[in-house]
Amino acid sequence: MKILTIILSLFIITVANADIKGSVLSKASDKISEYTIGLIPGEGYTEASIDLREGFKPDYSILAVRELLKIDSGNIFTQFSLFNTEQANEEKIIGNFGLGTRKLFDDNTVLAGFNAFVDNDFSETNRRASIGFELRNAVLDFHSNIYEGLQDSDDERVLNGWDYRLASQVPYLHWSKIFINHYEWDGVLRDDIKGTKMGSEMILTRSLNFEIAYDDKDKKGLEDEWYAKILFVHPPRDNGSTAKDGISQVAFKDNKDMSGELLSKVKRNNKIMIEFKGSATVSRAD
């Protein structure tokens, strides 16, 4: 799987740096993103993704952000998603539903927001809630979330925890960001779980994003791993840099209007972290 991830990332980066306009990759990503909007009605951000991870089957998800109400220099929105994931060799279906508000400051160049979510495991009775905060501009993103278990199943215990994510635009590559994502989960029957993800997000085409990262876990029984994520988004971007723009002459973007980010997705861990009762195992950290 590690070899597959590396090959996949190199392949996509190589293709994306070519002249993608009119290429098979660009046309295919536009078609897939166009199809996703038909699955969820309404205007806003829609995303379909494939998550490739060492030692696990691929996870597939669909996510949408929709505006509920416009407010002065901001909005109130909802975000919901549905996806499959594998835990202890068992396939699970997880759903998330959240409400959030965002507001623009400093001539619309700074975005701040708060959100609250409920996560539900449709395969078990596991439920979790979270609250989150975000602060963003054209170059830097900061997200932080606190998670609290609401209900356990017979043989699984939902863990409480928190995380933060700090991302920065890569100098001269306006279509790429690097990020660090630290998380901690409070063990009940076993030790706490801590870890840090380090990786990169890339906007390859108007409709195709790619993320690759290394998940460094500080917990016996949970192996460190690479993961790669392919994301098809809709609607296609009307402006902004993509990989075909290559290297810019300017290190960082100018202060841009963040109004276009009011309906971007909330960055959080949508998967429910659990501990298995009566055994010495825990689920993967994401």
Question: What does each model-identified segment do?
Answer:
Residues 43-52, 74-86, 110-121, 131, ...:
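Transmembrane beta-strand segments that form the barrel wall of outer-membrane beta-barrel proteins
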Residues 50-60, 83-95, 120-128, 152-159, ...:
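Solvent-exposed loop/turn segments connecting transmembrane beta-strands
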